[in-house]
């Protein structure tokens, strides 16, 4: 991220909550029918055998959900604590520690990629670069599925489940994100929004599906 201090605070914050995050959110996709449907559709559209990247994977719940349905998944996260938590829980997923702005992956390595509530931690100046980096690691015609909170506000946490943290959650406008995707060499194929589920924070959610062109 553009500001090194900001970058480090995100990493430290997720390191701090990694174990509790992994425990509290285990099995969360059983209560998110739209998320499951979109991920299943992505899996169907990914060339068989092509790996799928989970960018900002946390402890790997989403990556494991895909792996359990036959996908070869690679989870990438900035937080060493999250990567460690994922490796301890999900042997079916390959985990790598890495930055959205400099992904530890080869050009064109992945058939598809997902980034659920990942770009919300980026400095606004870095969003374009992150999208370009996602495009770099995708194969031609590869798909990128994004999820994020809708709006223009920034929510700051200095305490999370009783742990001291220092982290911002940046809400984003779908039209702005779609414009960044198109400028970076993607064609946006789907935009969708939903309200929060009962167990979630009370925010509106957006999903964008884009294809590398």
Residue ranges and their predicted role:
Residues 1-47, 152:
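Conserved class I S-adenosyl-L-methionine
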Residues 150-168:
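Short, glycine-/aromatic-enriched active-site segment of Class I SAM-dependent methyltransferases
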């Amino acid at each position: 991220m553009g500001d090194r201090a900001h970058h480090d605070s995100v990493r430290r914050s997720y390191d701090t909550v990694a174990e509790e995050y992994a425990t509290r959110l285990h099995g969360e996709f059983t209560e998110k029918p739209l998320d499951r449907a979109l991920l299943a559709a992505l899996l169907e559209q990914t060339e068989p055998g092509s790996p799928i990247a989970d960018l900002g994977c946390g402890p790997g719940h989403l990556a494991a959900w895909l792996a359990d349905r036959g996908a070869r998944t690679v989870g990438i996260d900035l937080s060493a604590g999250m990567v460690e938590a994922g490796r301890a829980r999900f042997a079916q997923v390959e985990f790598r520690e890495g930055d959205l702005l400099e992904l530890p992956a080869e050009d064109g390595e992945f058939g598809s990629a997902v980034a659920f509530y990942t770009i919300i931690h980026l400095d606004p100046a870095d969003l374009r670069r992150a999208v370009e980096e996602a495009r770099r690691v995708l194969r031609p015609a590869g798909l990128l599925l994004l999820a994020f909170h809708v709006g223009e506000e920034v929510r700051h946490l200095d305490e999370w489940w009783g742990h001291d943290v220092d982290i911002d959650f940046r809400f984003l406008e779908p039209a702005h994100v779609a414009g960044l995707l198109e400028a970076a060499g993607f064609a946006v194929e789907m935009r969708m929004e939903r309200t929060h589920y009962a167990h979630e924070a009370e925010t509106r959610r957006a999903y964008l599906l884009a294809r590398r062109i």
